[in-house]
Design a protein with these regions (language model features):
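Two-metal-ion RNase H-like nuclease active-site motif
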Residues: 2-21
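Charge-biased, low-complexity intrinsically disordered regions
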Residues: 42-43, 53, 74, 104-106, ...
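Short Gly/Thr/Asp-enriched flexible loops that form oxyanion-binding sites at enzyme active sites
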Residues: 89-108
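Intrinsically disordered, low-complexity terminal tails and inter-domain linkers enriched
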Residues: 110-139
Length: 212
């Protein structure tokens, strides 16, 4: 979807990538304006790696699926270009190699797990294998967060009052986008909420497979 007469509006992008064991990997991309209204939304069909891909990509498989295949496709479809794109899984950060936009992984400040690790807000005690807290919406719809993380030395990190942001160290200038977030509306909003919208939309587009 895309709204009319929005080309001059400053926008903020959110990409959520989730996984279901029986269906594969899903991605959704939501762009919002200064009052958090949707400007564009795009989502993917499930992406299920082949056995050959699982073997050949090894531990880099989730970066390939989440970043190169899913996030790259989503961001390339958009008509609008946001000031920054926030992602909810570190495996998505590698899309930065193909997209000339600041890409930041966001989580609540003080989340467990060091840099990276932790979560984007929330109070659920359920955790993924990466240590990230899964939102109630993710759990309700059977989604898991991709667990891949690089070595901590490959990330650059910066904190604001309520959030921690990570990017790939080779693109550490992306952290300058936090200044725009601080100076604009964005940091005053719950940065988790747009991800929840994406997950709800993904669950509508791709219902859970019913047990036989």
């Amino acid at each position: 979807m895309a709204s009319d007469n929005v080309s001059s509006q400053k926008s903020l992008g959110f990409v959520s990538v989730r996984h279901r064991l029986d269906q594969g990997y899903f991605g959704g991309y939501l762009l919002i304006n200064s009052v958090a209204r949707p400007l564009e939304f795009h989502c993917t069909v499930p992406v299920q790696p082949t056995r050959a891909q699982s073997i050949l990509f090894g531990p880099t498989l989730e970066e390939f699926l989440c970043g190169e295949q899913i996030c790259r496709a989503l961001l390339s479809r958009a008509k609008l270009q946001p000031q920054v794109v926030l992602v909810d899984a570190p495996a998505a950060l590698c899309v930065r190699h193909w997209i000339d936009l600041p890409i930041l992984w966001v989580r609540a400040r003080g989340a467990p797990g060091g840099a990276p690790g932790g979560t984007l807000g929330g109070t659920s005690s359920e955790q993924s294998s990466s240590g990230e807290l899964l939102s109630p919406t993710s759990l309700e719809h059977g989604f898991q967060t991709p667990s891949h993380q690089r070595n901590a030395s490959e990330y650059a990190e910066r904190s604001s009052e309520h959030y921690q942001f990570c990017c790939l160290d080779s693109y550490r200038s992306d952290l300058d986008a936090i200044d725009w977030l601080n100076e604009s509306y964005a940091i005053e909003h719950d940065l988790r909420e747009p991800f929840e919208r994406i997950i709800e939309a993904l669950s509508e587009a791709h219902p859970r497979t019913k047990a036989a």
